[in-house]
Curated annotation (Swiss-Prot):
Assembly notes: Monomer.
Entry's Gene Ontology BP terms: queuosine biosynthetic process; tRNA wobble guanine modification
Taxonomic superkingdom: Bacteria
Identification of the protein by name: S-adenosylmethionine:tRNA ribosyltransferase-isomerase
Gene3D superfamilies (alphabetical): QueA-like (3.40.1780.10)
Matching InterPro entries: QueA, QueA_dom1, QueA_dom2, QueA_sf
Subcellular location(s) per record: Cytoplasm
Source species: Stenotrophomonas maltophilia (strain R551-3)
Upper classification of the organism: Bacteria, Pseudomonadati, Pseudomonadota, Gammaproteobacteria, Lysobacterales
Catalytic reaction equation(s): 7-aminomethyl-7-carbaguanosine(34) in tRNA + S-adenosyl-L-methionine = epoxyqueuosine(34) in tRNA + adenine + L-methionine + 2 H(+)
EC number per UniProt: 2.4.99.17
Length: 343
């Protein structure tokens, strides 16, 4: 299977550059199995589409202000994007500079303090930070929010709230689980009143989520690593839901990635650790019965994943419908409620 099989043409003006005033006012494209028709709705219509006893699974990761700037001893400018906090004031990061920094070199940070290069970890660097408080706390005021590269503006104060889900609590992501951005307190209350249950996993979305697939043949693609935690409580919630005839709905590709990484011989089990799972058509997703997901970039691994779930032809039909109806795409864009292909 080729990367180019997942390309499509998107007018640039459909790439959302800012969130709507209300989270749940985003549009929602209902995509049932073929041949049923698509339906244009809003995210706040979700309670009418779900049933009592259904389980919505959210990703509770919290985005850190992970972008930093500084300079090397030579005076060369450096941009740092933290990929993961490692503990002990260390982090794994992408480092952008005119020349690759060497182990032992130090970067003077614009926000104060220094980052010492300890060595390489694949395409990343391991950095030791010398800052006056815990790295996590220091980043809250010293770091910049790492908005995706297709958002063509500098992050503002509103982004600190809006590029974060209302249920974010586990610090560690460098990108938001964007399907969750549509859920506000009124919508969550309406879903609860409907009898819909909520569960959470944690998957810390890494900088690799923005990296393009470079291999033409998908079997040659090396998937990026991300850390996740699927807890015992969530596993029990899923089992109870299924036993009672309810549906499990994953809110976002990160939730599905976490759940599928925790599947063992067709059974969901507690799991904490790294995953490199790469889901493409031909893979059968068993952990969820439906997905809420945003519209994804051409040739992206996320587009490949939802094509595995709902069928590539069906997904591309939905995307063409969304383009024709002027839906908003990508992180701050609209969403779809996606059901699996029949059979």
């Amino acid at each position: 299977m080729k990367k180019s099989d997942f390309n499509y043409n998107l007018p640039a003006e459909l790439i959302a550059q800012a969130p709507l005033a209300e989270r749940s006012a985003s549009r929602l494209l209902l995509v049932p199995p073929a041949p049923d028709a698509f339906t244009d709705l809003q995210v706040r219509d979700l309670p009418s589409l779900l049933q009592p006893g259904d389980l919505l699974v959210f990703n509770d990761t919290r985005v850190i202000p992970a972008r930093l700037f500084g300079q090397k001893a030579s005076g060369g400018r450096v941009e740092i994007l933290i990929e993961r906090l490692l503990g002990g004031q260390q982090a794994r990061a992408q480092v952008g500079a005119s020349k690759s920094p060497k182990a032992g070199s130090r970067i003077a940070l614009d926000a104060g303090g220094e980052a010492e290069v300890l060595g390489r970890d694949g395409e990343f660097y391991v950095l030791q930070f010398h800052v006056p408080e815990s790295l996590e706390q220091w980043l809250l005021h010293a770091g910049r929010l790492p908005l995706p590269p297709y958002i063509q503006r500098e992050p503002g104060m509103d982004d600190r709230e809006r590029y974060q889900t209302v249920f974010a609590r586990e610090v560690g992501a460098v990108a938001a689980p964007t399907a969750g951005l549509h859920f506000d307190e009124p919508l969550l209350a309406a879903l609860k009143d409907k009898g819909v249950d909520f569960g959470h996993v944690t998957l810390h979305v890494g900088a690799g989520t923005f990296q393009p697939v470079r291999a033409d043949d998908l079997k040659d693609h090396v998937m990026h690593r991300e850390w996740l935690n699927v807890g015992a409580e969530l596993v029990q919630q899923v089992r109870r839901t299924r036993a009672a005839g309810g549906r499990v709905i994953g809110v976002g590709t990160t939730v599905v990635r976490a759940l599928e990484s925790a599947m063992r011989d067709g059974e969901l089990l507690p799991f904490a650790g790294e995953t490199q799972i790469f889901i493409t058509p031909g893979y059968r997703i068993r952990s969820v019965d439906a997905m809420v997901t945003n519209f994804h970039l051409p040739e992206s691994t996320l587009l490949m994943m939802i094509s595995a779930f709902a069928g590539k032809e069906r997904v591309f039909e939905a995307y063409q419908h969304a383009i024709a109806q002027r839906y908003r795409f990508f992180s701050y864009g609209d969403a779809m409620l996606l059901f699996p292909q029949a059979g």
